């Protein structure tokens, strides 16, 4: 059973949200990435980088500054947040009707090295990490298979190959990874017989035909500032957690990027626009969509100011017993999100590699027609932790 979230961790959660929105903005600033659909788990990346921070020495301050409040901060806050996230936010309550969640951290270290006992204890106890010795030097392909199989198992087959071909060789010394699986049923499922084909307007001004889910039931919708926000709660288990998907729909058909900019520059934006009550709906349409998205995150993290871990100046000496320097060469992240009448299925994995409610008020009918590009996120509302975030520019594109 998930426990109550510690109050002193809530500020760290605000920092995690800030990191999530900055990273989302960095992804969208790349024209090639921005043109398609995007889905990723900032929580997965945050936990992976926090684990690196736990093993860093002189490099630690820069990591904490990016992951925390933008100042020097304290690595202990990141460890405390990770522990609360693993034990509270990502606890599995599917047996009592809540979302099915699986989350795992893994540390794969070359047989020529050994983890420092203090780091291994912290990783196992606070991050619930699995540690495993592998032979990158002599059995590279076998080691890659072990990492990929581990991710595939945790994500129940949604993510089969987190490590791209050629990404690991005999100079690889360490892989830190995590994998996340989320499957939630809507609190109010959509009637499949109401799903109809209609037009979705693309950013270039053209239109496509796609499947839209529809409903006449009351919905959580807020309207303000040329923006509508839809909250779709997932069915709950017996604990206090409440997961929800949020659809942020700009008023203008081409308003996605201006909305994205506001989201990244105003950390309180999400909280200020969360619908607080249900309303009667008029025309209500939400497209079904499926997104598979993968990217290498080191260049994005550098753009955010995280330079040292990826350079020869990296100091990860609190992680392994070795006289040889260790730096992070790659951070691979892959996500999958599917939204349909039943609910949402989502998965994410990150690997970092080292190389040497109130009563509803009576209101007018509110339309919510998501027939043009929009942002979405999946959040645990009690803690305020953003688990997945992304945007849909074309619901017909799945990869």
Swiss-Prot record:
Gene3D superfamilies recorded: Alpha-1-antitrypsin, domain 1, Antithrombin, subunit I, domain 2
Which InterPro entries does the entry link to?
A: Serpin_CS, Serpin_dom, Serpin_fam, Serpin_sf, Serpin_sf_1, Serpin_sf_2
Q: Which cysteines are cross-linked by disulfides?
A: none
Which tissues is this protein detected in according to the database? Answer: Highly expressed in embryo and endosperm. Is accumulated and stored in the endosperm, where it exists in a free and a bound form. Expressed in roots, coleoptiles, shoots and leaves.
From the UniProt entry, list the residue stretches annotated as the region RCL: 343-367
Q: Which UniProt keywords apply?
A: Plant defense, Protease inhibitor, Seed storage protein, Serine protease inhibitor, Storage protein
Residue ranges of region Signal for targeting protein Z4 into the ER lumen? Answer: 36-56
Q: Where is this site: Reactive bond?
A: 357-358
Q: Which GO terms describe its biological process?
A: defense response
Question: For this UniProt entry, what's an example GO CC term?
Answer: extracellular space
Q: Per UniProt, what is one GO molecular function of this protein? A: serine-type endopeptidase inhibitor activity
Alphabetized CDD domains for the sequence: serpinP_plants
Q: Which SUPFAM superfamilies did the record assign?
A: Serpins
What inducers act on this gene? Its expression is regulated by the 'high lysine' alleles Lys1 and Lys3a.
* Record family assignment: Belongs to the serpin family.
Q: What does the entry note on its domains?
A: The reactive center loop (RCL) extends out from the body of the protein and directs binding to the target protease. The protease cleaves the serpin at the reactive site within the RCL, establishing a covalent linkage between the carboxyl group of the serpin reactive site and the serine hydroxyl of the protease. The resulting inactive serpin-protease complex is highly stable.
What is known about what this protein does?
Answer: A major component of the endosperm albumin, this protein acts as a storage protein during grain filling, contributing a substantial part of the grain's lysine. May have an inhibitory function during filling or germination. Inhibits cathepsin G in vitro.
Name of the protein? Serpin-Z4
Give the organism the record lists.
Hordeum vulgare (Barley)
């Amino acid at each position: 059973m998930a426990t109550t979230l510690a109050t002193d961790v809530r500020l760290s959660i605000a920092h995690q949200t800030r990191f999530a929105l900055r990273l989302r903005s960095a992804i969208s600033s790349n024209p090639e990435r921005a043109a398609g659909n995007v889905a990723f788990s900032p929580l997965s990346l945050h936990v992976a980088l926090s684990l690196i921070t736990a093993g860093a020495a002189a490099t630690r301050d820069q990591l904490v500054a990016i992951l925390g409040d933008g100042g020097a901060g304290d690595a202990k806050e990141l460890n405390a947040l990770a522990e609360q996230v693993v034990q509270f936010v990502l606890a599995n309550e599917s047996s009592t009707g809540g979302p099915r969640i699986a989350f795992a951290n893994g540390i794969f270290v070359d047989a020529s090295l050994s983890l420092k006992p203090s780091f291994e204890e912290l990783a196992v106890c606070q991050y619930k990490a699995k540690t495993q010795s592998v032979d990158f030097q002599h059995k590279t392909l076998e080691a890659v298979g072990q990492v990929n199989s581990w991710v595939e198992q945790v994500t129940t087959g949604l993510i089969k190959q987190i490590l791209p071909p050629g990404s690991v060789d005999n100079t690889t010394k360490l892989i830190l990874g995590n994998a996340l699986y989320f499957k939630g049923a809507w609190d109010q499922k959509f009637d499949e017989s109401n799903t109809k084909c209609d037009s979705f307007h693309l950013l270039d001004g053209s239109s496509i035909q796609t499947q839209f889910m529809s409903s006449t039931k009351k919905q959580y919708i807020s309207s303000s500032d040329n923006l509508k926000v839809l909250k779709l709660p997932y069915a709950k288990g017996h604990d206090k957690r409440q997961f929800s998907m949020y659809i942020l729909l700009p008023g203008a058909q081409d308003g996605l990027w201006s909305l994205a900019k506001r989201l990244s520059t105003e950390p309180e934006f999400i909280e200020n626009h969360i619908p607080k009550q249900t309303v009667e709906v008029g025309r209500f349409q939400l497209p079904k969509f499926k997104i598979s998205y993968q990217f290498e995150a080191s260049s994005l993290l550098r753009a955010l100011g995280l330079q040292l871990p990826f350079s020869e100046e990296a100091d990860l000496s609190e992680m392994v017993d070795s006289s040889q320097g260790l730096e992070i060469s790659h951070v691979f992240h892959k996500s999958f999100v599917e939204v349909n009448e039943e609910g949402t299925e989502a998965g994410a994995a990150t690997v970092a590699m080292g190389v040497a409610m109130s009563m509803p008020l009576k209101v007018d009918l509110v339309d919510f027609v998501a027939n043009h590009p929009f942002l979405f996120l999946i959040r645990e509302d009690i803690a305020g932790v953003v688990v997945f975030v992304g945007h849909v520019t074309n619901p017909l594109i799945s990869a």
